[in-house]
Amino acid sequence: MGNLISTFLSSSKGNSTAQITDCSIWCPRPGQHISIRTFRELNRAPMSNPTSRKTGTVSNGDCSRLTEEVLEADSRHQTTQLPRH
């Protein structure tokens, strides 16, 4: 059986009451293909793509690396300021 993967994300923007919370726990089997898709739309800029997708094949020891990549990409996305028009 593969490693247990647990992720939790909670964020809010400024003085807004909007809050995004995501929590998921799963345990993929070695060799199992997983796809993680996230969608976020808060004051979307024109021509931006709010959907991101991460895919990978799970093997022992690689689960946490894949999860870290997803969380790191999400963290970078949250801290990026969108240009104002």
From Swiss-Prot:
GO terms for biological process: symbiont-mediated suppression of host innate immune response. Residues 44-63 are annotated as: Disordered. It is found in: Host cell membrane. Disulfide bonds: none annotated. GO terms for cellular component: host cell plasma membrane; membrane. InterPro entries: Gemini_C4. Pathogenicity determinant. May act as a suppressor of RNA-mediated gene silencing, also known as post-transcriptional gene silencing (PTGS), a mechanism of plant viral defense that limits the accumulation of viral RNAs. This is Protein AC4.
